[in-house]
């Protein structure tokens, strides 16, 4: 275009004058135009001066950058007008013009850089822009980075400043960034992906992030890359664990555990689990089962590998109850072999339980106290050390912990004392449900163990809540359950025992109910005779069972763990329960009661209703008057509606028992509906 313009002839009479300053470009002019004839010589001027000691850099941008940068000149006219002022600042300068396509790169006293792409701009303006590689990200991404640099002067900021500002942090710490991963946008995540490419380190985070081909792979690479290398330093393991915990994986799939299975050492597998998910905890129980089969000791595993990361399993494996040495020794053996998940053989020690009180005898001592009974179905003494651990975590120390015996047979229907003797009782069924059948869509026994352990953290929390409104909480179970009795059900070398004629076999053969017409019976070997509600039973005293069909833990093998525990028999894990009494550290203020809305009530046909309010929430209420029981119902707001019938007097004195404690009497004033009683018929005139 310039050459065509230069060579165009103009009329001699034309008064048009075009002056085109071309800076530092005589060599380019000579190359494009070549020789000039004598008619043109008078129209080319070269303004020259002594070489400058200064070097100048002028970046020429396309209009697409007009909103992303603050140029020194926002068009060519401004540049022609102010270039001397701009260059005098002695800093790199910038021009935005639509003529950027006609600009050529030049080097020398004045360096000219035409810039059309966002990446080229970044490489130009960032102090360490040379470390960036354009193919790492898309043009749209680099454009967003350009927007982040609009307030920086050229060469005064580096890429790390851009990243830190975008992440709103003062220094880059991968664990802190990972903890916010779910709240970061795609742009911020891609900056993290770029960080270790621009600034690689010897940290595990750097190694794993550089393995990610895109930002979406970062969590997976952080989690998995350490499983694929042969040498894992303790530092890398610690860094990986901190990052994985921060990323908070909600679940792990089978492919992840397949990678874990390839690791040669079981100890390493346990070290690489976060124990934040149910799947990981289940996998840990599986790994520990293999370790115990190979001769490892439960206490050693618990102390060195579990106490910090999975304290509930550590407690289950190593803690003792401390009430009875024989029982502690047996339960330690039982818990170890339960995790091994193999039938251990014959019942190791024939035990008698005469030295232990019945459960109700121990609980009866709290009768008359402000005490709530918390029953956990299936809470055998197997779990007592774990529950004590969970209470301790919450700063709760029981007043007493004692072993007691459940009633034979050890089934709930023979042990439901909570609805026989205690109006202030709650009951949980989840532990027993887990023990019998696991979860509806999960029949792994190792998974079942994890569910069982989780009950006691929740139970300790429940105790804490109950103590807010009660002086005492007593925790117990109706019975325990036996894994080995379930495994024995399918053992070829365990021969079922034939039940007496006309008896009914119950609970997978753990006991049988004798016919009412059966005469005196001598207990069979390994059985005990029991009586309940006029019925007689033969109860198994070991892991054997009466002959009956069923599928308790059917299909369980070393490679395939199948859920299932049963009860009804007389083994220690089925028969022994704990009675744990917990008292508030500080006494509660006495419960007080007052009628809601005042003392007056309306009577209609002898029927009276009144709401009573209490100074704190109560669980049970008994109200009587003139030896008549009132009907009491708790309202949604915590007040209680008391309904009285057969009222004949004008004053009603109520006897109130709240939470098992007798409160001061409450007197109500009765008025009959539709009749107003006036004790002064003369209106106060004094006659």
Where are the predicted features?
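…; additionally, a secondary subgroup of soluble metalloenzymes is captured
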Residues: 1-371, 378-473, 477-687
């Amino acid at each position: 275009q310039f050459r065509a313009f230069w060579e165009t002839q103009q009329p001699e009479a034309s008064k048009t004058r075009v002056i085109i300053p071309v800076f530092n470009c005589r060599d380019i002019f000579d190359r494009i135009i070549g020789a000039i004839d004598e008619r043109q010589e008078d129209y080319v001027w070269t303004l020259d001066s002594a070489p400058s000691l200064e070097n100048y850099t002028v970046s020429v941008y396309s209009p697409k950058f007009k909103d992303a940068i603050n140029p020194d000149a926002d068009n060519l006219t401004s540049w022609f007008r102010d270039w001397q002022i701009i260059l005098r600042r002695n800093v790199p300068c910038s021009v935005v013009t639509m003529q950027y396509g006609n600009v050529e790169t030049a080097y020398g006293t004045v360096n000219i850089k035409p810039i059309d792409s966002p990446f080229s701009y970044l490489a130009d303006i960032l102090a360490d822009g040379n470390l960036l590689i354009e193919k790492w990200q898309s043009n749209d991404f680099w454009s967003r980075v350009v927007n982040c640099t609009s307030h920086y002067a050229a060469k005064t900021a580096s890429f790390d400043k851009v990243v830190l500002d975008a992440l709103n942090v003062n220094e880059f710490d991968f664990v802190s960034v990972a903890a916010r991963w779910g709240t970061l946008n795609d742009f911020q995540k891609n900056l993290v992906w770029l960080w270790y490419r621009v600034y690689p380190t010897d940290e595990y985070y750097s190694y794993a992030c550089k393995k990610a081909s895109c930002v979406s792979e970062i969590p997976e690479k952080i989690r998995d890359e350490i499983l694929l290398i042969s040498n894992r330093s303790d530092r890398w393991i610690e860094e990986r664990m901190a990052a994985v915990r921060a990323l908070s994986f909600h679940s792990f799939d089978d492919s992840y555990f397949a990678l874990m299975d390839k690791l040669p050492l079981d100890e390493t597998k346990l070290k690489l689990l976060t124990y934040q998910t149910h799947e990981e905890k289940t996998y840990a129980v599986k790994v520990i089962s293999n370790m115990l089969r190979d001769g490892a000791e439960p206490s050693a595993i618990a102390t060195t590998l579990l106490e910090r990361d999975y304290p509930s399993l550590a407690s289950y494996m190593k803690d003792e109850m401390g009430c009875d040495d024989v029982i502690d020794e047996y339960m330690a053996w039982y818990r170890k072999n339960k995790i091994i998940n193999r039938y251990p053989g014959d019942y190791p020690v024939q035990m008698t339980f005469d030295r232990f009180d019945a459960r109700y005898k121990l609980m009866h001592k709290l009768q008359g106290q402000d005490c709530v009974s918390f029953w956990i179905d299936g809470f055998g003494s197997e779990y007592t050390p774990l529950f004590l651990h969970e209470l301790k975590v919450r700063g709760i120390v029981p007043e007493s912990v004692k072993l007691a015996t459940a009633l034979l047979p050890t089934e709930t229907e023979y042990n439901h004392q909570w609805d026989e003797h205690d109006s202030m009782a709650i009951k949980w069924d989840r532990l027993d449900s887990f023990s019998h059948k696991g979860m509806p869509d999960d029949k792994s026994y190792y998974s079942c163990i994890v569910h069982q352990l989780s009950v006691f953290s929740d139970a300790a929390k429940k105790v804490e809540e109950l103590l807010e409104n009660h002086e005492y909480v007593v925790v117990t179970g109706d019975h325990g359950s036996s894994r080995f009795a379930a495994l024995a059900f399918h053992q070829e070398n365990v021969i079922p025992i034939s039940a007496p004629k006309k008896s009914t076999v119950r609970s997978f053969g753990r006991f049988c109910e004798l016919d009412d017409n059966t005469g005196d019976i001598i207990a069979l070997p390994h059985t005990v005779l029991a009586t309940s509600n006029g019925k007689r039973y033969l109860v198994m005293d070991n892991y054997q069972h009466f002959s009956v069909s069923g599928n308790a833990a059917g299909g369980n093998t070393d490679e395939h763990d199948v859920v299932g525990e049963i009860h009804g028999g007389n083994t220690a894990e089925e028969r022994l329960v704990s009675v744990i009494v917990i008292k508030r550290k500080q006494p509660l203020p006495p419960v007080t009661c007052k009628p809601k809305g005042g003392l007056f009530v309306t009577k209609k046909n002898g029927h009276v209703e009144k709401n009573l309010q209490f100074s704190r929430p109560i669980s049970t209420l008994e109200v009587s008057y003139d030896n008549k029981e009132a009907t009491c119902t708790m309202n949604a707001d915590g007040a209680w509606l008391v309904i009285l019938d057969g009222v004949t007097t004008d004053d009603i004195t109520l006897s109130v028992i709240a939470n098992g404690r007798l409160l001061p009497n409450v007197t109500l004033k009765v008025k009959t509906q539709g009749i107003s009683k006036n004790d002064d018929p003369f209106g106060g005139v004094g006659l």
